[in-house]
């Protein structure tokens, strides 16, 4: 997608060679290890880095799996067990190991979310193109799915959009427009009219599940913190998600952060929980955890959740595993990638004092892009820059081919491989990609969109 020159190119090449060497050593040294009742050095080192980094001050346990969707399945099992114990649902140990189903456990989630393609992960997301009968005939949607407020840049202004389900008559213009993206994350908003509005809305939605005799329970909150990925690259108002977490804490509903997409510097910080200003009970990581080199995932959780599975009976344990759980090559890649991203000597984008990435996308160019008449919104955060094109009817949405001529031009004439999500296109650089490269790519995208004339 791009070429880097000089010393930085040599440094990145050196790091990649070192990563490949470590993976090769792990393959030769360990081969395949059945992880139950075993451990090896790469898995131990990776767990230490996870708990000392993204899990610092809240997590104490790591459960490995092979991909993000499976990490979500494990997280759901963890949250449901914790909820069931806290509510006294599993008091009778004899019944707890049978297949009796006298209650229904559901999730609280957001419309537009995406948590993976395995069956349980799909049940935890609202109806979408991914869950249609063509894709998943078993889908029923076991959750309460809320329509979230979103934040975006349009005409150079950072704005808040509220769904119809949330009444906005009490919000002033100052609550719906922000001088900068940093103001969106400001904790002073916790005492705003918007926070009260969100709290009332969420409480009303949860009220039908508050009756103690109800057989249906909201047993977990699962969200993609800040950015919804495959659902369209929407930025959810962080205040809404923060209030959502607070309301669930008050009701002893375990909180899951799906950071498969957002984790490990994707949004400019190591964990999106830093942007939200609140912590989960369970969080899932994959993708950039290994630098994108090989599949590996981790479900990270608290000691309290771990305790929910302790027992003298093996049947009470978390019986979820794979042949390639904590495979040594993946753990070695993760160790190297995590260290690489956190070290300013190998990641020149890292502001080590603040433990944040420097701004990668040129703000002036982003604002100019958002002001084009054929652009509906722009989301620019960390390594991500997403653009939604103005489109109506069948030209909008995931199934749309509206942007295909634009995509073809970018690929064939500009050497930029842009993946579309319907009428949404996006750029994602690496955490170590230089700002100059990002500006070069975004300038080409701006030029193409400014001359874009879709062919139907």
Could you describe each region identified by the protein language model?
Residues 1-456:
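Conserved N-terminal phosphate-binding loop of PLP-dependent enzymes in the Aspartate aminotransferase
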């Amino acid at each position: 997608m791009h070429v880097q020159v000089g010393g930085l190119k040599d440094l990145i090449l050196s790091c990649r060679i070192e990563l490949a060497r470590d993976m090769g050593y792990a393959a030769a040294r360990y081969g395949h290890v059945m992880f139950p009742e075993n451990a090896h050095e790469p898995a131990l080192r990776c767990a230490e880095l996870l708990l000392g980094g993204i899990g610092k001050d809240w997590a104490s346990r790591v459960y490995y799996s092979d991909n993000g969707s499976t990490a979500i399945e494990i997280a759901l099992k963890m949250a449901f067990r914790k909820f069931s114990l806290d509510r006294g649902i599993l008091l009778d140990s004899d019944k707890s190991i049978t297949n009796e189903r006298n209650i229904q456990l559901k999730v609280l989630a957001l419309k537009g979310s995406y948590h993976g393609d395995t069956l349980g992960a799909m049940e935890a997301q609202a109806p979408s193109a991914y869950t249609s009968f063509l894709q998943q005939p078993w889908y029923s949607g076991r959750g309460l799915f809320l329509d979230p407020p979103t934040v975006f840049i349009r005409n150079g202004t950072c704005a808040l959009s509220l769904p119809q389900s949330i009444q906005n008559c009490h919000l002033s213009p100052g609550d719906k427009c922000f001088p900068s993206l940093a103001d969106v994350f400001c904790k002073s908003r916790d005492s705003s009219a918007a926070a009260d509005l969100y709290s009332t809305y969420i409480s009303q939605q949860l009220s039908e599940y508050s009756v103690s005799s109800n057989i249906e329970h909201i047993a977990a909150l699962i969200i993609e913190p800040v950015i919804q990925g495959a659902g369209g690259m929407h930025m959810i108002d962080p205040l809404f998600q923060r209030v959502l977490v607070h309301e669930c804490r008050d009701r002893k509903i375990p909180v899951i952060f799906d950071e498969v997409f957002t984790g490990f510097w994707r949004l400019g910080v190591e964990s999106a929980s830093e942007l939200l200003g609140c912590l989960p009970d369970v969080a899932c990581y994959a993708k950039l955890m290994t630098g994108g080199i090989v599949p590996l995932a981790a479900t990270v959780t608290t000691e309290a959740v771990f305790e929910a599975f302790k027992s003298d009976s093996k049947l009470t344990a978390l019986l979820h595993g794979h042949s390639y759980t904590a495979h040594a090559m993946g753990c070695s890649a993760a160790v190297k990638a995590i260290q690489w991203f956190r070290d300013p000597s190998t990641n020149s984008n890292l502001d080590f004092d603040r433990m944040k990435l420097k701004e990668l996308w040129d703000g002036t160019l982003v604002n100019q892009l958002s002001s084009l008449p054929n652009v509906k919104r722009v989301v620019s955060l960390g390594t991500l820059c997403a653009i939604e094109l103005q489109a109506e009817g069948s030209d909008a949405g995931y199934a749309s081919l509206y942007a295909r001529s634009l995509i073809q031009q970018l690929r064939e004439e500009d050497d930029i491989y842009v993946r579309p999500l319907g009428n949404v296109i996006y750029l994602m650089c690496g955490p170590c990609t230089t700002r100059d490269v990002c500006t070069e790519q975004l300038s080409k995208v701006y030029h193409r969109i400014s001359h874009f004339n879709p062919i139907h």
